[in-house]
């Protein structure tokens, strides 16, 4: 007779062996299913590539490619109303800005009539400025001619002496020295352009002296009043 402990031990062994065999079987089934799924995907992708290549060869993919720009065109037409409203708003804003600017220019011209003179007046002013410039240039040129004539008169004696022995080039050096000495002796105060500045400076000096005299007289008067009060 077998003991119950031996029976239980045999049952446990059989159960463990059955569990192992079931686990191995499930693992084998799962691996087989995974392999089949991967193979199916590969076959499906290969069939897709083949169909695409055949369609490319036959030219059946051209209408598919033309469908995309049609969609873009539809979307542009869909948003055209929004874009038109934006453009209209911008045009209105620009028109308002132009009107405000023109109104401000008119007001400025009314406030400052001198700045908004006619082109004829501006041309007359330009002509007067040109005439003053021409007068100043003529005055300066006449003054230069006078100085040159004076230099020629001053050097007539030396020129008469040096006309005969012109063959010797060294005789021209003293003439150059004399000319340079004469030009250096001319003071800048004789220039007509400086007369205005000199007169202006003299007027400023006289005004300052007058102010000093007035201040001194007032101080003396105050001092005399204080002395009389004491």
Swiss-Prot record:
The chain crosses the membrane at residues 17-37. The keyword Membrane applies. It comes from the Eukaryota. It is found in: Membrane. Keywords: Glycoprotein, Membrane, Transmembrane, Transmembrane helix. InterPro entries: DUF4718. Pfam families: DUF4718 (PF15842). It is a single-pass membrane protein. One of its GO terms (cellular component) is membrane. Glycans are attached at residue 126. This is Uncharacterized protein C1orf185 homolog. It comes from Mus musculus (Mouse).
């Amino acid at each position: 007779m077998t003991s119950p402990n031996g029976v239980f031990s045999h049952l446990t062994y059989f159960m463990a062996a059955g569990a192992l065999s079931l686990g191995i079987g499930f693992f084998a089934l799962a691996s087989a299913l995974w392999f089949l799924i991967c193979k199916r995907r590969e076959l499906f992708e290969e069939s897709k590539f083949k169909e695409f290549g055949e369609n490319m060869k036959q030219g059946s993919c051209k209408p598919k490619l033309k469908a995309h720009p049609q969609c873009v065109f539809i979307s542009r037409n869909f948003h055209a109303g929004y874009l038109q409203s934006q453009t209209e708003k911008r045009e209105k804003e620009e028109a308002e800005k132009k009107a405000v600017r023109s109104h401000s220019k008119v007001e400025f011209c009314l406030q400052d009539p001198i700045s908004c003179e006619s082109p004829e007046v501006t041309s007359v002013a330009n002509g007067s400025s040109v005439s003053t410039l021409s007068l100043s240039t003529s005055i300066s040129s006449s003054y230069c001619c006078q100085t040159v004539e004076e230099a020629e008169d001053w050097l007539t004696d030396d020129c008469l002496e040096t006309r005969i022995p012109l063959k010797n080039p060294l005789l021209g050096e003293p003439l150059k020295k004399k000319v340079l000495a004469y030009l250096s002796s001319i003071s800048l105060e004789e220039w007509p352009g400086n007369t205005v500045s000199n007169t202006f400076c003299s007027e400023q000096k006289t005004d300052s002296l007058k102010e000093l005299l007035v201040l001194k007289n007032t101080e003396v008067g105050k001092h005399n009043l204080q002395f009389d009060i004491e």
